[in-house]
């Protein structure tokens, strides 16, 4: 099965994705990372109002295989978290990009340097192909 990597997202080396809509960023984990992790059993996410800092951990995801930290692709304030995933973390495996997002963040200061640390979908496809 070929995994999808939507073109409207930016990706990190650590496999998080970011979808920008003005000053609001939706953050989740790529289909590749979720496929590698296997069945997701627990998700730890920040609360609304919490600050996240680019490059630092903002939560963790636990599967039957491993526990992995989640890294912030941008800095900002959490304005929403996907409560449905807290109750049913396995949902992230079913649809990581639409229903399986983790948090929404009001971005502090988005600049080109910050986005330079991310990859396009095509660049990300090439990276994950090299990992296999």
From Swiss-Prot:
NCBIfam families the UniProt entry points to: gcvH, PRK01202.1
Cofactor note: Binds 1 lipoyl cofactor covalently.
Source organism superkingdom: Bacteria
UniProt entry tagged with the keyword Flavoprotein: no
A Gene Ontology biological process term: glycine decarboxylation via glycine cleavage system
Domain Lipoyl-binding: 24-106
Residue numbers carrying N6-lipoyllysine: 65
Entry keyword annotation includes Transmembrane helix: no
Cofactor names: (R)-lipoate
Family recorded in the similarity comment: Belongs to the GcvH family.
InterPro entries: 2-oxoA_DH_lipoyl-BS (IPR003016), Biotin_lipoyl (IPR000089), GCV_H (IPR002930), GCV_H/Fam206 (IPR033753), GCV_H_sub (IPR017453), Single_hybrid_motif (IPR011053)
Cellular component, GO annotation: cytosol; glycine cleavage complex
Protein name, per record: Glycine cleavage system H protein
Keywords, in A-Z order: Lipoyl
Signal peptide: none
Functional description taken from the UniProt entry: The glycine cleavage system catalyzes the degradation of glycine. The H protein shuttles the methylamine group of glycine from the P protein to the T protein.
């Amino acid at each position: 099965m070929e995994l999808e990597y939507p073109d409207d997202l930016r990706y990190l080396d650590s496999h998080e994705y970011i979808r920008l809509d003005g000053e609001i960023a939706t953050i989740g984990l790529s289909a590749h990372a979720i496929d590698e992790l296997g069945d997701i059993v627990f998700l730890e996410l920040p609360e609304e109002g919490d600050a996240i800092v680019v490059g630092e951990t903002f939560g963790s995801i636990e599967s039957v295989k491993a526990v992995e930290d989640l890294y912030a692709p941008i800095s900002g304030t959490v304005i929403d978290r996907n409560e449905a995933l807290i109750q049913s973390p396995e949902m992230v495996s079913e649809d990581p990009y639409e229903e399986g997002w983790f948090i929404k963040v009001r971005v502090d200061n988005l600049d080109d340097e910050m986005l330079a640390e991310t990859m396009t979908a095509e660049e990300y496809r090439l990276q994950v192909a090299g990992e296999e």
